[in-house]
From Swiss-Prot:
One of its GO terms (cellular component) is extracellular region. Transmembrane segments: none annotated. PROSITE patterns: EXPANSIN_CBD, EXPANSIN_EG45. Keywords: Cell wall, Cell wall biogenesis/degradation, Membrane, Secreted, Signal. InterPro entries: Expan_Lol_pI, Expansin, Expansin/allergen_DPBB_dom, Expansin_CBD, Expansin_CBD_sf, RlpA-like_DPBB, RlpA-like_sf. This is Expansin-A17. Residues 71-185 form the Expansin-like EG45 domain. The keyword Signal applies. GO terms for biological process: plant-type cell wall loosening. It comes from Oryza sativa subsp. japonica.
């Protein structure tokens, strides 16, 4: 039997597949690849910078600021942290974490009223990627830094060191919400199967958070399927989905003023769980 590689049509298809594969990059999942696309132009986010508020900050985890311990409660893994947020992350105390709705939000922090603040009190912008859980065995002002109602940021060490000296341990800060500046479109990482699909929503611009997610097949004009918030940045869809068709995703932010976008190219046809896909638009 003649080799199929002698067929010009098959050879061309294979060449195109190789060229397409060259456009994918590593993300945070086991076999994690996502389709890298350019962001489409869009309106400036209506989410505005807030006023300054009082809080406090410490640091935790690997000195590099990169690793799985910086995103567990939200659903990020190490490669997500590295590729999306670098070392500019923090675990949020319960009031800021807001049952996972605070995941992905961006804050600007500056050290105040401490001899350990770096000269000039420089600020740093971080993304909330984890929960700093309360410690009810310690008082709020002596070790229970993340106990409610405290507004506390347990930061990746490199970000904390931009604010203050390591010897401080804990410093008072002022913080404010700021619009998240992201590169590229919203990213969707998939787990589960064709009957229960779990979507990890990352790289969200503007308010940075999500309160509602719906999906529908891209080619057939079907009805929207409302996803349920699972935990952190994850949403689950209980429906039979045919992966031969791509998925369009509708997202609404959690913070006010709420904004909704439709990512028509969110997940390409023949999608596979375990991979990450990136749409072409965001909350800009």
């Amino acid at each position: 039997m003649a080799s199929s590689w002698n067929n010009p049509a098959i050879f061309l298809a294979a060449a195109l597949a190789v060229a397409t594969a060259a456009q994918v990059v590593t993300a945070g999942f086991t076999t994690d690849l996502y389709w890298q696309q350019q962001p489409a132009p869009g309106a400036v986010t209506p989410y505005k910078t807030s006023d300054w508020h009082d809080g406090s900050a410490t640091f935790y985890g690997d000195p590099s600021g990169m690793g799985d311990d910086f995103g567990g409660a939200c659903g990020y893994v190490s490669n997500d942290i590295v590729s999306l947020y670098s070392t500019k992350t923090a675990a949020l105390s319960t009031p800021l974490f807001a049952d996972g709705n605070g995941c992905g939000q961006c804050y600007e922090l500056r050290c105040v009223k401490s001899p350990w603040c770096n000269p000039g009190s420089p600020s740093v912008v971080i993304t909330g990627t984890n929960l700093c859980p309360p410690n009810w065995y310690l008082p709020n002002d002596d070790g229970g830094w993340c106990n409610p109602p405290r507004h506390h940021f347990d930061m990746a060490p490199p970000s904390f060191l931009k604010l203050a000296q390591r010897v401080a341990g804990i410093v008072p800060v002022q913080y404010r919400r700021v619009p998240c500046q992201r590169t590229g479109g919203v990213r969707f990482c998939l787990q589960g199967n064709h009957y229960w699909l779990l979507l990890y929503v990352m790289n969200v611009g503007g308010a940075g958070d999500v309160s509602s997610l719906s999906v529908k097949t891209s080619g057939g004009g079907g009805a929207w399927i409302q996803a349920a918030h699972n935990w952190g940045i994850t949403y689950q869809v209980f429906a039979a989905l045919d992966n031969s068709d791509g998925l369009t995703v509708k997202l609404t932010t959690y913070s006010t003023p709420q904004q909704t976008i439709i990512v028509s190219d969110a997940i390409s046809p023949w999608w596979i769980t375990g991979l990450c896909y990136q749409g072409s638009n965001n909350f800009y």
